[in-house]
């Protein structure tokens, strides 16, 4: 930690604790859940580096693996998988490999995926369509489209592993995210040649890709093809992609027009639709329309969710309309909708921008009395707020509590604190943070 002494500007607050670090146990949690998390899962991870444990309880190992995959901890997942392979009861399964490829794709680890594929073959398993599709996804998400396409070509040569509509859709999704719409067109042509029709998900993927790229003519052209197809009709996801695209492009007229046209097609909106409308009107500064959507939702018995309230709170906060933001936050709590870390981030950012440090203090007090799960972005937000306010003591205390809350500081955390300490001429604190930054694996070049 930084050894530098800083002015203790909020002694009372520091003594009482900024954020309660007591472990708050929910009495409704099942004992089995606690045991699984605290004993089985963590225990398996500790044993993953050892050669001794060859007769572990199957349920514990498999749940530990699922937990690591779910949380995208690819290194832990591979260690646990290696431990799994050593168990006397282990049987190789394609489904397990497919799950591992998924996490490796999410974490952009193509080399690890290639090695894992070799391990799979060495165990005598015959890859399935799902395995190849997952491998294509890994390469695509890692921006290795050549490898993704070569895997697709290999699939075509395997008699019982011909690529299906899901395989093509996964590849299309990767190309859309990389802006390779030339390849998207060639994939669709190839699908037609092979007699593989586009599904609703395929069309939606292309529509969403064009929309996010601001290619509205192409987006509407694909929608026309979808309607003409007749077998894969537009659904609420299509609606959300279309209006979301025009909303992001600040084309409110088109957004509202397509909303009405989809209703005439019999496609009914869902909560995501309304959230998109609220967000779009908010970004455009059309606050009356934003509020009218919320009123419409309540009249139609759509429950306003945490996401809905977060959008409105952030919108009013960014606009500097603090009173309106506070009104919405009060309504949120009155309606029994639970705030999350994103809610509190928006509040802190707005108060910080308005110079209302006292209000930020009140946010901290509310968090102490709640069971909200805090994350690194929240700590970055509130550390920045107190840093800008010149309250270095509180900033430092919050940094300490990050570790107590198991929130790992990232490059934003370090950059924010280093900038603040530099501005105040506290250079020994800067040096200490730079050391911690290096030891944590962060790059000093970002500073």
UniProtKB/Swiss-Prot annotation:
PPR repeats lie at residues 93-127, 128-158, 164-198, 199-233, 235-269, 270-304, 305-339, 340-374, 375-409, 410-444. InterPro entries: Pentatricopeptide_rpt, PPR5-like, TPR-like_helical_dom_sf. GO terms for molecular function: mRNA binding. Gene3D superfamilies: Tetratricopeptide repeat domain. Keywords: Repeat. It comes from the Eukaryota. Belongs to the PPR family. P subfamily. NCBIfam families: PPR. This is Pentatricopeptide repeat-containing protein At3g53170.
């Amino acid at each position: 930690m930084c050894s530098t002494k800083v002015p203790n500007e909020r002694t009372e607050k520091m003594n009482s604790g900024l954020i309660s670090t007591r472990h708050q146990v929910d009495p409704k949690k099942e004992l089995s859940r606690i045991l699984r998390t605290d004993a089985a899962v963590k225990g398996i991870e500790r044993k993953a580096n050892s050669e001794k444990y060859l007769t572990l309880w199957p349920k514990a190992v498999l749940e530990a693996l699922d937990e690591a995959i779910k949380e995208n901890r690819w290194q832990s997942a591979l260690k646990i998988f290696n431990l799994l392979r050593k168990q006397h009861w282990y049987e190789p399964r394609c489904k397990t490999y497919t799950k591992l490829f998924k996490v490796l794709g999410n974490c952009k680890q193509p080399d690890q995926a290639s090695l894992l594929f070799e391990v799979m073959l060495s165990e005598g398993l015959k890859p399935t369509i799902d395995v190849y599709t997952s491998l294509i996804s890994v390469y695509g998400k890692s921006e290795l489209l050549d490898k993704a396409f070569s895997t697709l070509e290999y699939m075509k040569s395997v008699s019982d592993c011909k690529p299906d509509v899901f395989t093509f859709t996964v590849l299309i999704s990767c190309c859309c995210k990389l802006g390779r719409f030339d390849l998207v067109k060639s994939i669709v042509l190839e699908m037609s040649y092979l007699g593989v029709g586009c599904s609703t998900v395929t069309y939606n993927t292309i529509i969403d890709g064009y929309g996010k790229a601001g290619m509205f003519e192409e987006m509407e052209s694909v929608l026309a093809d979808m309607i003409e197809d007749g077998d894969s009709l537009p659904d609420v996801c299509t609606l959300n992609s279309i209006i979301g695209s025009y909303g992001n492009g600040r084309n409110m007229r088109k957004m509202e027009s397509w909303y009405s046209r989809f209703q005439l097609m019999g496609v009914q909106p869902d909560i995501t639709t309304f959230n998109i409308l609220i967000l779009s009107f908010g970004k455009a500064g059309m606050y009356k329309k934003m509020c009218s959507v919320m009123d419409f939702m309540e009249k139609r018995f759509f429950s306003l969710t945490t996401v809905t309230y977060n959008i409105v709170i952030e919108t009013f906060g960014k606009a500097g309309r603090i009173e309106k933001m506070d009104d919405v936050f009060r309504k949120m709590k009155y309606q029994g909708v639970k705030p999350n870390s994103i809610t509190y981030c928006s509040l802190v950012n707005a108060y910080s921008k308005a110079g209302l440090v006292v209000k930020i203090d009140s946010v901290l007090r509310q968090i102490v009395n709640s069971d909200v799960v805090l994350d690194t972005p929240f700590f970055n937000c509130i550390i920045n707020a107190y840093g800008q306010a010149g309250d270095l003591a509180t900033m430092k205390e919050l940094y300490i509590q990050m570790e107590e809350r198991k929130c790992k500081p990232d490059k934003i955390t370090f950059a924010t604190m280093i900038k603040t300490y530099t501005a105040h001429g506290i250079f020994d604190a800067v040096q200490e943070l730079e050391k911690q930054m290096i030891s944590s694996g962060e790059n000093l070049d970002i500073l």
